[in-house]
A protein has these predicted regions:
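Exposed, interaction-prone assembly regions rather than primary DNA-binding/catalytic cores
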Residues: 58-111
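A broadly conserved detector of short glycine/acidic/proline-rich loop/turn motifs that flank catalytic sites
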Residues: 33, 89, 118
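Hydrophobic/aromatic-lined pockets within catalytic cores
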Residues: 18, 57, 119, 123
Length: 160
């Protein structure tokens, strides 16, 4: 069958070292985009939490892991790169509000990543620099989470 032939070809190129097989059913070129891979390992998922907050200058602690939000919680090591996923309820995907898409990469805005972090940590989190965050955008996103505790924690953290 064509599927069997394709599998044999893929296995041949993996053994030869021309392509990588980081996870079952996922094949990449040797030089792959780590952000794109993060969004492909578990689907649907989007980059968020510490990864986005670090890139946005909201937290300063160095962590090389790519952190994402998905339908399950897992940590995966691929070629020494850690990919960490935190589970969030599907209804909190908010129809993509605060999630940007570029090619095959889905990434939360800093405001969305902030709210995801506060929501998942029940407010037990620390932020080094809140200036990059747009409080108006946060206020618009908060009601979509349907969480009074998120609202309270956010108001306390942002002093609003």
């Amino acid at each position: 069958s064509d599927g069997g032939r394709l599998t044999k070809m893929l296995n041949y190129y993996v053994k030869k070292g021309d392509i990588l097989n980081p996870r079952r059913g996922i094949y990449t070129k040797r030089s792959f985009n780590a952000e794109e891979l993060a969004c492909s390992i578990f689907h649907p998922s989007y980059l968020s939490l510490e990864y986005v907050l670090k890139k946005s200058g909201v937290i300063f602690q160095y962590d090389s892991a790519l952190t994402s939000v998905s339908y399950l919680s897992r940590t995966v090591d691929i070629s020494g790169q850690m990919y960490s996923y935190r589970q969030i309820k599907p209804e909190l995907w908010l129809g993509g509000e605060g999630i940007m898409q570029k090619d095959n990469i889905y990434i939360a805005s800093a405001e969305r990543a902030f709210l995801d972090m506060v929501y998942l940590s029940a407010g037990n989190c620390y932020f080094d620099n809140l200036r990059p965050l747009d409080k108006r955008k946060i206020k618009v996103l908060i009601p979509s989470y349907h969480s009074k505790s998120l609202e309270q924690h956010t108001k306390k953290i942002l002093n609003i």
